[in-house]
C-alpha cells in the first residue's frame, strides 16, 4: 500500500489491521523509532526487509519495536525481487533454486569461486520467457556459505550482501 512513508500516524493506523510489513529497512526503522518515541505498541507476526543492507543492530531495534522477527530478503528488479530469503535460523538467505540459478564468480576472470569465497553474484532465471537472464552480473558482492543451514531445507545459503562491485573501464573496485 505504501511507498515512501510520509505520514507515520496514517501508516501505523494501517499496521493495526496488518500482521506483517514488507519494506525498506530504513523506512521500517524510522517507523520503529517513531513508535518508541510516541510510546506506540503494535505487535506484528513478521517483517521482511528488502532493497538495502541491514545492520544487526537495526534488526534488533526493529524486532524490539514490533515484537517480531525480521527476515532479510535479497532480490533484484530484474528477478521480480524474489532471489533469496532468510529462514528462521537467520544464518544467511536461501536462494529460490526452482526459479533462479545463483553463482558467485571472480569478477576479474569470470570463473566460479569456491563456496565461502567472495565474488560477484551472477544469476540465471529459469521461468522468464520474455526476457530470460543468463549469467546476469548483478554487481553485488557476496558469497555462498560452505556450511548448510541448520534448518531442514536442503538449499544453498547466500551470506548477507557485503557491497557492490564497480566496473570502471578495465578495472574493478571491490
Give each language-model segment a name.
Residues 2-174:
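Active-site glycine/GP-rich loop and adjacent strand/helix microenvironment
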Amino acid at each position: 500500500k505504501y511507498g515512501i512513508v510520509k505520514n507515520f500516524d496514517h501508516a501505523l493506523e494501517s499496521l493495526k489491521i496488518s500482521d506483517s510489513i514488507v519494506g525498506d529497512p530504513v523506512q521500517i526503522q524510522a517507523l520503529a523509532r517513531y513508535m518508541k518515541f510516541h510510546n506506540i505498541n503494535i505487535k506484528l507476526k513478521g517483517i521482511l526487509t528488502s532493497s538495502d543492507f541491514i545492520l544487526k543492530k537495526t534488526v534488533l531495534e526493529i524486532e524490539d519495536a514490533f515484537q517480531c522477527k525480521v527476515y532479510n530478503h535479497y532480490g533484484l528488479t530484474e528477478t521480480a525481487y524474489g532471489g533469496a530469503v532468510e529462514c528462521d535460523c537467520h544464518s544467511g538467505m536461501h536462494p529460490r533454486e526452482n526459479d533462479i540459478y545463483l553463482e558467485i564468480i571472480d569478477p576479474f576472470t569470470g570463473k566460479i569461486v569456491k563456496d565461502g569465497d567472495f565474488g560477484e553474484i551472477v544469476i540465471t532465471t529459469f521461468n522468464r520467457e520474455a526476457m530470460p537472464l543468463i549469467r546476469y552480473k548483478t554487481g553485488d558482492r557476496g558469497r555462498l556459505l560452505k556450511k548448510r543451514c541448520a534448518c531442514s531445507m536442503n538449499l544453498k545459503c547466500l551470506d548477507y550482501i557485503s557491497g557492490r562491485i564497480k566496473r570502471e573501464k578495465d578495472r574493478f573496485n571491490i
